[in-house]
Every structure is written in structure tokens, then in C-alpha cells.
């Protein structure tokens, strides 16, 4: 038996905001009677940028900055039209990127 799945992938730089957004989506989806699988934590991307502190020489003096992207996956099994309508209305913080696949 094939079942419909909606996959929601959230990305953000702050893990607390991503987790807070996931709980909002789970509460909204479960309110319509849909089954929710997750949240599944995906590997965190870490981007390290190294720059020289001095302008001309002194290569030994460097500074490193890093940017971490936290990701979570959520699956909603057999979503109804009401589930999709509720998910469109969920207000998420500005630091979260959402990607929905059916």
C-alpha cells in the first residue's frame, strides 16, 4: 500500500529556533489528525572561514570564523487538504528556511 508523504525540511543557524519551529508544525499537523514522523535531526553543516588578521604579512596570525547550519526533517503521513491549509498559516521565525516536498 502506497501512502502519501509530505517531507518538511527546516534549516537555520540557531538550533533553538529550528526546534521551536518544528514543535509549532507538529502541533498544527496533529491538530488536523495527521500522523507525524520525526523530528529527524540531519547532519549539521559547518563552514569555517579563515582570514589573516594583518593586512600585508604575518601569516601566522589568523582568525577563524564558523557558521553552522542546523537541519531537521519532518514527515507527515497521509496529509489531508486541511493539514496543508493549516501548515500554510503557521507563522515561523525569520531565521528558519523551510522546504516542503510532496
From Swiss-Prot:
Q: Which GO terms describe its cellular component?
A: ribonucleoprotein complex; ribosome
GO molecular function, one example?
Answer: structural constituent of ribosome
Give the record's GO biological process terms. translation
Q: Does the keyword Transmembrane helix apply?
A: no
Instruction: Supply the InterPro entries for this chain.
Output: Ribosomal_uS10, Ribosomal_uS10_CS, Ribosomal_uS10_dom, Ribosomal_uS10_dom_sf
What keyword terms does UniProt attach to this protein?
A: Ribonucleoprotein, Ribosomal protein
Alphabetical list of NCBIfam families matching this protein: PRK00596.1, rpsJ_bact
Please give the function described in this protein's UniProt entry. Answer: Involved in the binding of tRNA to the ribosomes.
Similarity comment: family membership = Belongs to the universal ribosomal protein uS10 family.
Subunit comment: Part of the 30S ribosomal subunit.
Q: Do you know which PANTHER family this protein is assigned to? A: 30S RIBOSOMAL PROTEIN S10 FAMILY MEMBER
Please state what the protein is called: Small ribosomal subunit protein uS10
- Higher taxonomy: Bacteria, Bacillati, Mycoplasmatota, Mollicutes, Mycoplasmataceae
Identify the gene encoding this protein: rpsJ
Amino acid at each position: 500500500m502506497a501512502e502519501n508523504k509530505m517531507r518538511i525540511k527546516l534549516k537555520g543557524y540557531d538550533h533553538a529556533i529550528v526546534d521551536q519551529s518544528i514543535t509549532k508544525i507538529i502541533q498544527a499537523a496533529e491538530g488536523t489528525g495527521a500522523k507525524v514522523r520525526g523530528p529527524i535531526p540531519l547532519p549539521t553543516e559547518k563552514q569555517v572561514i579563515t582570514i589573516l588578521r594583518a593586512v600585508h604579512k604575518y601569516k601566522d596570525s589568523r582568525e577563524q570564523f564558523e557558521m553552522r547550519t542546523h537541519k531537521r526533517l519532518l514527515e507527515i503521513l497521509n496529509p489531508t487538504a486541511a493539514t496543508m491549509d493549516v501548515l500554510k498559516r503557521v507563522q515561523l521565525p525569520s531565521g528558519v528556511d523551510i522546504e516542503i516536498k510532496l
